[in-house]
Amino acid sequence: IPEDAWVLSPNAFDQPKPAARHTVSFTRGIPTALDGKAMDPVTLIETLEAVGGPYGIGRGIHVGDTVLGTKGRVAFEAPAADILLTAHRELEKLVLSGPQQRIKDQVATQYGDFVHEGKQLDPVCRDIEALLTSAQQRVTGDVKIVLRPGNLFIEGVISPHSLLAATKGVYGEKAGEWTPADALGYSRILSLPGILQTRAGGKK
């Protein structure tokens, strides 16, 4: 695709740019502020488009399947969507349980497929929306982002509902919620199915 075809990110990678830092705030999963300034969703999206476009954020070419089963190839620019989705996902990692994240990701993908196929009026979409709404009750906090040409980096996440802050340990460094003996017993229980299968097969 020719460079002049890009609308939001023309020549985004031609010249070096200094890193730009911003903070995106969410309330129950909804983006509500940028750099501490409250904004309605439309204004916030328009602002992020202007902020991320010059860095080539959300710019790409996609090959996918159409509803009719044919292949399609499109060039797209979606800086606001890229920033919001990435920031929102990092906030969810901090406040949602592992099972919540996995189930939400599964149904969100299915929901997207339904909408893409024109099935958004099917009652199952209301069921999925109820689950997604429930899952967002604690998705509140601030996400610090750093923009560089072609790169979106998450610098930090803060939330009053942080599950990391609720533990006494530091991930990858030390544990505060269990003892070495607890860890030994837990490891033994987790490995028990494999131990029994090996024993039943005559292997030691």
Positions of PLM-derived features:
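Nucleotide-activated chemistry modules centered on ATP-dependent adenylation/adenylyltransferase
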Residues: I1-K204
